[in-house]
C-alpha cells in the first residue's frame, strides 16, 4: 500500500506541474488542435488549443513507476522490482501512444483535423498489439504463471472457454486475434470518447481506480497466498504491481484533468487517448478480466456503439441519421445540452458502469464462499 501511495502521489505531482510547462512549449511552437468543420459550432472556439497532452501523462506514468520501485528498493533492497506484467502494459501504452503521437503530428504539420488514415492507424495498432500478445504468453514466473492466458476470463479464467482447445499453436494464434480485438476496441473506444473537455480523462480515472481495487484484491486472494480468506482464488501474475500501475495512471490523469477540464487549456490528443485505451486493454487482459471490461469500460462501449449504429443506419437508409451526430456526446450537444452538462452526466454514467463491473467482480467471489 505504501508503494501505491508513493506512486500515485508522484504521478499527481508530475502531471500537475508538467502539464502547464508542456502547454507553454506547445504555445511557443504553435502546436494547436484543428477542429472538424462538421462538428458542433461551439467547438470552433477551441481551434488552436494545445494538443498532444497525453505525452505528459505517459511520461508522468513512466517516471512515477520507475521512481516508486527505486524508492521501495532503497527502503528495502529485497523488495520486488518491476514485474513482467507491468512492463508489458507499459509497452502497450507507450506503443499506442506513439501511434497517436504520429497521428497528432500529422494533423499539426499539415494543419488539418485528420491525421493518419484509418487503415494505417489500424495496421500500426495491430503491430503493437501483436507484439504485446506474443510477449504476454511468455515470461512465466516461478509458479509457471504467464502474464496472460489462452483462457477467456470474466472475473477469472473460464475453464470451458480455452482458446487452446485445438492445441498450443492454434491457441496462441487465436489469443493474438482475441487480444488484438480487445486492444483495438479499447483504444478506439477511448479515442471516440475524447471529444469534450475532460470527458475521456475523467472517465478513465474511474476505470483505472477500479483496476487498482481489483489488483489489490487479486493480490490478497491469490492462489497460495497466506492472506486468502476462502472462496475462489486468482491465478494472476503480478496483481499488486498492476494495481500500482493503475493507481499511477489514475493519479496522473487527475493531475492532467486539472488543466483539461472545461474550458480546456490542453487536449490529450490521440497521443493520450490511444495510450489510455491501450492501458485499459492491457489491464483487462493481464488481470484476466477481459469480459468484465464491457462493464468497467461501459461508457467507452456505449459511445463506440453509437458510432456503429450511426454508420449502419446511414448506409441502410441511404443517407438518414439515427443520431443528430455521432459519437453520442455530440448528439446531446446538438440537442442543446451545455458541454459541461454532457461531460458530468457521462461521468456519472461511466461511474455507474464501473460500479456495476466492481459489483460483478466481488459478487462472483462472495457466491463462491
From Swiss-Prot:
Tree of life domain: Bacteria
Pathway, per record: Cell wall biogenesis; peptidoglycan biosynthesis
InterPro entries reported in the protein's UniProt record: Glycosyl_transferase_4, PNAcMuramoyl-5peptid_Trfase, PNAcMuramoyl-5peptid_Trfase_CS
Protein localization: Cell membrane
Gene Ontology CC annotation, any one: plasma membrane
UniProt entry tagged with the keyword Metal-binding: yes
GO molecular function terms attached to this record: metal ion binding; phospho-N-acetylmuramoyl-pentapeptide-transferase activity; UDP-N-acetylmuramoyl-L-alanyl-D-glutamyl-meso-2,6-diaminopimelyl-D-alanyl-D-alanine:undecaprenyl-phosphate transferase activity
Keyword set, alphabetical order: Cell cycle, Cell division, Cell membrane, Cell shape, Cell wall biogenesis/degradation, Magnesium, Membrane, Metal-binding, Peptidoglycan synthesis, Transferase, Transmembrane, Transmembrane helix
Pfam families documented for this protein: Glycos_transf_4, MraY_sig1
GO biological process terms on file: cell division; cell wall organization; peptidoglycan biosynthetic process; regulation of cell shape
EC number: 2.7.8.13
Membrane topology term: Multi-pass membrane protein
Protein purpose: Catalyzes the initial step of the lipid cycle reactions in the biosynthesis of the cell wall peptidoglycan: transfers peptidoglycan precursor phospho-MurNAc-pentapeptide from UDP-MurNAc-pentapeptide onto the lipid carrier undecaprenyl phosphate, yielding undecaprenyl-pyrophosphoryl-MurNAc-pentapeptide, known as lipid I.
NCBIfam families according to UniProt: mraY (TIGR00445)
Protein name: Phospho-N-acetylmuramoyl-pentapeptide-transferase
Gene name as annotated: mraY
Amino acid at each position: 500500500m505504501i508503494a501505491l501511495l508513493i506512486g500515485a502521489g508522484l504521478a499527481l505531482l508530475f502531471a500537475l506541474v508538467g502539464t502547464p510547462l508542456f502547454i507553454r512549449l506547445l504555445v511557443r511552437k504553435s502546436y494547436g488542435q484543428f477542429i472538424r468543420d462538421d462538428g458542433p459550432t461551439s467547438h470552433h472556439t477551441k481551434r488552436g488549443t494545445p494538443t498532444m497532452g497525453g505525452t505528459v501523462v505517459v511520461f508522468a506514468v513512466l517516471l512515477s513507476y520507475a521512481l516508486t520501485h527505486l524508492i521501495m528498493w532503497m527502503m528495502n533492497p529485497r523488495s520486488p522490482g518491476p514485474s513482467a506484467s507491468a512492463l508489458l502494459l507499459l509497452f502497450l501504452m507507450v506503443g499506442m501512444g506513439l501511434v497517436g503521437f504520429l497521428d497528432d503530428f500529422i494533423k499539426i504539420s499539415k494543419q488539418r483535423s485528420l491525421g493518419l488514415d484509418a487503415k494505417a492507424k489500424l495496421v500500426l495498432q495491430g503491430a503493437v498489439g501483436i507484439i504485446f500478445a506474443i510477449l504476454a504468453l511468455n515470461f512465466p514466473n516461478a509458479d509457471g504463471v504467464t502474464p496472460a492466458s489462452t483462457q477467456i476470463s470474466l472475473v477469472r479464467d473460464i475453464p470451458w472457454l480455452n482458446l487452446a482447445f485445438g492445441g498450443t499453436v492454434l491457441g496462441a494464434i487465436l489469443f493474438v486475434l482475441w487480444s488484438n480485438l480487445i486492444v483495438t476496441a479499447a483504444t478506439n473506444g477511448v479515442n471516440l470518447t475524447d471529444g469534450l473537455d475532460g470527458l475521456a480523462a475523467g472517465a478513465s480515472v474511474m476505470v483505472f481506480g477500479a483496476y487498482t481495487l481489483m489488483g489489490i484484491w487479486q493480490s490478497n486472494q491469490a492462489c497460495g497466498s497466506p492472506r486468502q480468506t476462502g472462496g475462489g482464488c486468482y491465478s494472476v501474475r503480478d496483481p499488486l504491481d498492476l494495481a500500482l500501475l493503475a493507481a499511477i495512471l489514475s493519479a496522473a490523469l487527475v493531475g492532467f484533468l486539472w488543466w483539461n477540464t472545461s474550458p480546456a487549456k490542453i487536449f490529450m490528443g490521440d497521443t493520450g487517448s490511444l495510450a489510455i485505451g491501450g492501458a485499459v486493454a492491457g489491464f483487462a487482459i493481464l488481470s484476466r478480466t477481459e469480459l468484465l471490461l464491457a462493464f468497467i469500460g461501459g461508457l467507452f462501449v456505449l459511445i463506440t456503439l453509437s458510432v456503429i449504429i450511426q454508420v449502419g443506419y446511414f448506409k441502410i437508409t441511404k443517407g438518414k441519421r439515427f443520431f443528430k451526430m455521432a459519437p453520442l456526446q455530440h448528439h446531446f450537444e446538438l440537442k442543446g445540452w451545455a458541454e459541461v452538462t454532457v461531460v458530468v452526466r457521462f461521468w456519472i454514467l461511466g461511474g455507474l458502469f464501473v460500479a456495476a463491473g466492481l459489483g460483478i467482480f466481488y459478487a462472483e467471489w462472495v457466491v463462491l464462499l
